[in-house]
């Protein structure tokens, strides 16, 4: 996905297994807003060519139970195991100012305060217990981790596709 334009379809979940014998499926939510499934009416399965009606049935542990239009038995539901559930980009929940979806950040240009290009964000790393890290790849292919905090990230402009960072000495060195 790095370097590509932002996706038109956003993954909100992945089918993990059938639920019961009448075609319902268990879905692992890949969204920060699993409550979105409560009001979900339509979803695309693995791409824009297969849009179906969706009906929320409940939560079980960390999974969502959905009924999908046209899926009426366990065998049909089993064939969906591993399928991505997608929604149009316009249907994602708006975030508060200063918060961004990974798909908005990945691919944007990273510059220093003087406008000198430093690279592009190729990944957002969520493994730090303190804050996210932006993985910035330079033209020669080196990667650097930039903490996603105001001390380093001075500006993110999604319209221009630019992130301004103020790196401390040594942050971008070998």
From Swiss-Prot:
Gene3D superfamilies attached to this UniProt entry: PRC-barrel domain, RimM
Gene Ontology molecular function: ribosome binding
InterPro entries hit by this protein: PRC_barrel-like_sf, PRC_RimM, RimM, RimM_N, RimM_N_sf, Transl_B-barrel_sf
UniProt keyword annotations, A-Z: Chaperone, Cytoplasm, Ribosome biogenesis, rRNA processing
Bilayer-crossing regions: none
PRC barrel domain mapped to chain residues: 97-171
Description of how the protein assembles with itself and partners: Binds ribosomal protein uS19.
Name of the featured protein: Ribosome maturation factor RimM
């Amino acid at each position: 996905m790095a370097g590509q334009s932002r996706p038109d379809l956003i993954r909100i979940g992945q089918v993990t297994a059938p639920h019961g014998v009448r075609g319902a499926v268990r879905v692992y939510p890949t969204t920060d807003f699993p409550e979105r499934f409560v009001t979900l009416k339509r979803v695309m399965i693995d791409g824009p060519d297969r849009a179906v009606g969706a009906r929320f049935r409940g939560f079980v542990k960390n999974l969502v139970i959905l009924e999908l239009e046209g899926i009426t038995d366990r065998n049909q539901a089993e064939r969906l195991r591993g399928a991505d559930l997608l929604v149009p980009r316009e249907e994602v929940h708006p975030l508060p100012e200063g918060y961004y979806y990974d798909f908005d950040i990945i691919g944007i240009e990273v510059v220093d305060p003087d406008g000198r290009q430093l690279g592009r964000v190729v990944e957002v790393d969520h493994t730090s217990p303190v804050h996210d890290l932006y993985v910035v790849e330079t033209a020669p292919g080196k990667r650097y981790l930039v903490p996603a905090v105001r001390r380093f990230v001075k500006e993110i402009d999604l319209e221009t596709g630019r992130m301004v960072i103020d790196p401390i000495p040594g942050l971008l060195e070998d």
